[in-house]
Amino acid sequence: TAAAQGTVTQATSKSTGVTLNKPAGVITMNNASLATATNATFTLTNSFISANDTVILTLAGGQTTPGSYNVFANALAAGSVSITLRNISGGTLSEAVVINFAVIHCS
């Protein structure tokens, strides 16, 4: 349902953390430049996340050319997860990439 979803926009840079206390939502990243073969990592703070959960991420928009990025979750902890965006395009990009996320409670 719409009440279970939220949106947040990253300020300042691609490494700036965001807070969204919803089980699913949309993160719009900052449009700072990201060189090819480079990672940008930020923290999503979210009270719905526990250390045993799974966070699913999908690139949902903001890309001129689909397939220019990889996105993955790492460093899962109670209340937060680190999200890494990697530029795999072969050139420097300055795009406000949109990431959908969903928290799946595992135990």
Where are these regions (language model features)?
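Extracellular receptor-binding modules and their adjoining Ser/Thr/Gly/Asp/Asn-rich linkers
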Residues: 1-51, 75-107
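Surface patches in mature domains of proteins
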Residues: 63-76
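Terminal beta-strand-rich extracellular "head" domains
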Residues: 53-64
